[in-house]
Amino acid sequence: SSLKYQLLNPQSGELLAKGLCERIGIDGKFTYKPQLAGKEKLDAVDVAMPTHSEAIQAVLNALVDEKNGVIASMKEIDAVGHRVVHGGEAFASSVVITDEVLKAIEDCNPLAPLHNPANLIGIRACQQVLPGVPMVAVFDTAFHQTMPAKAYMYALPYEYYENDKVRRYGFHGTSH
């Protein structure tokens, strides 16, 4: 399991830092790339990350590190955006995450069993370590919500769509 992250300046859109937590739950590799001059990069450093909560804490620790951090305090984090693979037909745009949104994402787990459960773990881990910070879900499937039925219906029995929402959704919408 992995976690990609970026920290942006909300006023200018400037990239402050980015990186990757890999092998969460196994042996943990942490990459941190601050974009400010004079800050030291960490590349695939061994860091214990038994859960997503520890991975997120490693990211936050790097962001506020006295020597190589790019912000002074976690209080500077105004919001967190989460890429969520599957929003089904429930979400045609990005949304502020509420308990109802979490439930709707969970309801889409059968449509993205490898991704949505991990997305939910990441969201809940962020909520745990950044309580009170607004979280936003950005859905890969939202970009393609304007497809007409003739484009998204598969040549399968219609009951698969009615009962299980099996249809073409289109993915990688956050790349467009």
Residues of each region from the PLM?
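Electropositive phosphate-/nucleotide-binding environments in soluble metabolic enzymes
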Residues: 15, 49-53, 57, 95, ...
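Short capping/connector residues at structural and topological boundaries
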Residues: 13, 26-29, 102, 110, ...
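Short glycine-rich, Thr/Ser-proximal phosphate-binding strand/loop in the N-terminal lobe
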Residues: 2-49
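Short, well-ordered coil/turn elements that cap or connect secondary structure elements
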Residues: 11, 16, 74, 130-132
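A structured beta-alpha segment of the ubiquitous adenosine-cofactor-binding alpha/beta core
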Residues: 41-73
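Short beta-strand-loop/turn "lid" adjacent to the catalytic site in phosphate-handling enzymes
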Residues: 63, 67-115, 136, 143-151
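ATP-dependent carbohydrate kinase catalytic cores
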Residues: 116, 120-176
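Short glycine/proline- and acidic residue-enriched helix-loop micro-motifs
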Residues: 41-46, 104-109, 162-166
